[in-house]
From Swiss-Prot:
The keyword RNA-binding does not apply. It comes from Ralstonia pickettii (strain 12J). This is Inner membrane-spanning protein YciB. Coiled coil: none annotated. It holds the Pfam family IspA. GO terms for cellular component: plasma membrane. It is found in: Cell inner membrane.
Amino acid sequence: MKFLFDLFPVILFFAAFKVAGIYVATTVAMVATVLQIAWVWFKHRKVDAMQWLSLLIIGVFGGATLIFHNETFIKWKPTVLYWLFGVVLLGSVVVVRKNLIRAMMEQQVSLPETMWGRLNLVWALFFLVMGCLNLYVAYNFDTDVWVNFKLFGSMGLMVVFILAQSVWLARHMQERPANAANDANIGDDR
């Protein structure tokens, strides 16, 4: 359900583009992102840093698109977000010696130490490549193709990447000790 909620601005952007064009779609995406963050704040009294970052980027690139009446800015938005993700994943290991993928996933997955480094690198490279691919589509195809790629192509590639990664990780997963598995479920309401 969270995945669909996170896609809310993208889906509305796509629908608005099909009905009214890129500038209305950009406005809709900006408003939808603000509403999404307001809802999260209202419900949880906390908003993730990534959601704030997304709001900042849609504000800057969406705003530039509307002010300068130039769709190139909104086409750069996914690339900037992807590249930021990739750089943060790589930079966190180098600068603060923290593997962010491990920090996010180690409660669900037990892997050998070397695999965590590889997983972080693979995710970083995936995001860097996705940013390049977005620019390739944005500059070599018309806006209609880019909008379709933004929703269907990007999501499709993400799903394929996650499935391939799952198969790859399954070969390297370690069994957790019985007491560690029970400790992980303490307080679980299932």
